[in-house]
Amino acid sequence: MAATVKKTGSKKSKRNVPNGVVHIQSTFNNTIVSITDTSGHVISWSSAGASGFKGARKGTPFAAQTAAEAAARRALDQGMRQIEVLVRGPGSGRETAIRALQVAGLEITLIRDVTPLPHNGCRRPKRRRV
């Protein structure tokens, strides 16, 4: 029987990444914040659901703020200082997440809206009657 080898230390090495890109996907139900380096490798991520919110509270601006703060904290630990922000989606947490990144100490150099707009593609869902 083979002997088990015990690993020591963490699997991820601490990289020093000064510049990065923050992808904020904000839907009506949740907000996901991913922070990558300039080549697209994910350094840290967080979401409203991962921050402890459940159900309808995941779609609130406060949930987006806490998700952005958590992701920014981990990125700052890896040495990130300057970021570009790419925002996607129509959700309520867009501006709050950007403000939380700025307050956390990251310098924002660019904010771009990359929400996909159809050139009359798929049929829209039917209107809700409440």
From Swiss-Prot:
Q: Which GO terms describe its biological process?
A: translation
What are the protein's UniProt keywords?
Ribonucleoprotein, Ribosomal protein, RNA-binding, rRNA-binding
List the coiled-coil residues: none
Q: Which GO terms describe its cellular component?
A: ribonucleoprotein complex; ribosome
| InterPro entries xref list | Ribosomal_uS11 (IPR001971), Ribosomal_uS11_bac-type (IPR019981), Ribosomal_uS11_CS (IPR018102), Ribosomal_uS11_sf (IPR036967)
Known partners and oligomeric status: Part of the 30S ribosomal subunit. Interacts with proteins S7 and S18. Binds to IF-3.
Q: What does this protein do?
A: Located on the platform of the 30S subunit, it bridges several disparate RNA helices of the 16S rRNA. Forms part of the Shine-Dalgarno cleft in the 70S ribosome.
Designated name of the protein: Small ribosomal subunit protein uS11
Task: Please name the source species.
Answer: Prochlorococcus marinus (strain MIT 9312)
